[in-house]
């Protein structure tokens, strides 16, 4: 883990450094995995869902920015829970839920990696066992990588952020020249169920903005820089997502979208950039998903280390097993693999979206409770809280009306986090 005291004598981070962290965290594997899923629900109106998702992220980013500016640390959301909600059962349950949310996100991204790998290496095939094989394989490889080295994660991400952005910008520029307005005109508004389902999924593509808060302790003037960084990073990402959605719906037919929803970005590249462009985008997607799994595993392991040092996990979880890995790391990885095998990409996206929304709603509660200390605007926080509540209720209702089994996993995640927290407190584990 990084030592944050005195910033290790390194030059403090400026505005564009923090913005780069935010864009890199948001514009990652999520867009490769989620764009097709969102387009299946909203079709020509997909860009509207990404725009609304960006607005929700802006409100949430405001709460995050004020907390990060006032309480700079590398603990991020876990530290916010402790400060605003104390060290009781509720705070611990939210920390466990956030940890579980990251685990579900890894499973989702692994599924996307498997889909792109099969599309690239077994053209025309959509065999489930092949997708699962590649998905489980990349989780195992990245777990091993994290067990051997901590230092390579950051450097790898910097390189891959540049590659991802260049590939996506190339796709957008090519798409603008061949944009077909008739394909992206909204003839009828989507149903409320489709709208809220899509908002929940698109918000997941923005969820990485929280990573900027983890860098607050390395910023020269966090009170000034953090709010600006959140605004710029989320704004740029929103424009990028809207552009990608317009390009996708303009050049990929509904039939292709239904068949290749998990690899929609690559399908959009084929008519725009030819076979070479298609190969470049697929390789970019594989690199993006692999690096996202790597970075998220790194985050999960560090959060577990942080929670262990605060005595918020059983001692066994932090007991060393091999190199830098612990028993807790292995238990979480096994859980991730089980979820990868049990749920498809769409269901995993729904579970991760719902639990992310709930965790970020809790950040609003923390910000409201600490509003005087963090110099936050109460009206903005209240509006943001109400918007987040509306999205959560609408998203859950849409899943219920569809009879989605993801709802069972969402409820199970909430109950599991709460029960484990209660048991740990009762047994004085923490």
UniProtKB/Swiss-Prot annotation:
Cytoplasmic side: 1-14, 60-88, 150-157, 214-228, 294-325, 369-379, 425-430
Residue ranges, Periplasmic side: 36-38, 110-128, 179-192, 250-272, 347, 401-403
Molecular function as annotated in GO: transmembrane transporter activity
Membrane topology per record: Multi-pass membrane protein
Cited InterPro entries: AA/rel_permease1, APC_superfamily
Metal-binding among keywords: no
Keyword set, alphabetical order: Amino-acid transport, Cell inner membrane, Cell membrane, Membrane, Transmembrane, Transmembrane helix, Transport
GO cellular component: plasma membrane
Disulfide partners: none
Name of this protein: Inner membrane transport protein YbaT
Species of the source: Escherichia coli (strain K12)
Source species taxonomy: Bacteria, Pseudomonadati, Pseudomonadota, Gammaproteobacteria, Enterobacterales
Gene that encodes it: ybaT
């Amino acid at each position: 883990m990084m030592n944050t005291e005195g910033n290790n004598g390194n030059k403090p981070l400026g505005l564009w450094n923090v913005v780069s962290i935010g864009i890199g965290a948001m514009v990652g594997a999520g867009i490769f995995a989620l764009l097709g899923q969102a387009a299946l629900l909203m079709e020509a109106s997909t860009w509207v869902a990404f725009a609304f998702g960006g607005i929700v992220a802006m409100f949430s980013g405001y709460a995050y920015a004020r907390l990060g500016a006032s309480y700079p640390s590398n603990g991020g959301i876990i530290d916010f829970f402790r400060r605003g909600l104390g060290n009781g059962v509720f705070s611990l349950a939210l920390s466990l839920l956030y940890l579980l949310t990251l685990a579900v996100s890894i499973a989702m991204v692994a599924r996307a990696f498997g889909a792109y790998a099969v599309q690239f290496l077994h053209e025309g095939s959509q065999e489930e066992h092949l997708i699962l094989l590649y998905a489980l394989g990349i989780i195992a490889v990245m777990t091993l990588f994290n067990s051997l080295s901590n230092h390579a994660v950051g450097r790898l991400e910097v390189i891959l952020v540049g590659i991802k952005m260049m590939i996506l910008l190339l796709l957008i520029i090519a798409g603008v020249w061949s944009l077909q307005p008739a394909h992206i005109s909204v003839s009828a508004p989507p149903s409320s169920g489709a709208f809220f389902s899509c908002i929940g999924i698109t918000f997941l593509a923005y969820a990485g903005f929280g990573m900027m808060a983890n860098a607050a302790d390395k910023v020269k003037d966090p009170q000034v820089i953090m709010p600006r960084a959140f605004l710029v990073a989320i704004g740029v990402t929103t424009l990028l997502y809207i552009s990608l959605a317009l390009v996708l719906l303009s050049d990929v037919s509904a039939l292709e979208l239904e068949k290749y929803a998990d690899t929609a970005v690559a399908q959009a590249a084929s008519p725009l950039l030819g076979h070479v462009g298609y190969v470049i985008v697929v390789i970019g997607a594989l690199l993006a998903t692999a690096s996202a799994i790597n970075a998220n595993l790194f985050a999960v392991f560090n959060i577990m280390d942080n929670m262990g040092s605060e005595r918020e996990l059983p001692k066994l979880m932090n007991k060393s097993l091999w190199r830098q890995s612990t028993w807790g790391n292995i238990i979480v990885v096994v859980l991730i693999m089980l979820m990868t095998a049990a749920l498809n990409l769409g269901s995993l996206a729904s579970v991760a979206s719902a639990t992310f929304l709930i965790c970020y709603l809790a950040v609003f509660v923390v910000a409201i409770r600490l509003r005087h200390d963090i110099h936050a605007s109460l009206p903005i926080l209240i509006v943001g809280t109400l918007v987040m509540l509306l999205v959560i209720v609408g998203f859950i209702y849409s899943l219920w009306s569809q009879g989605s089994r993801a709802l069972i996993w969402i409820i199970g995640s909430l109950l599991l986090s709460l029960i484990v927290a209660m048991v740990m407190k009762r047994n004085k584990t923490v």
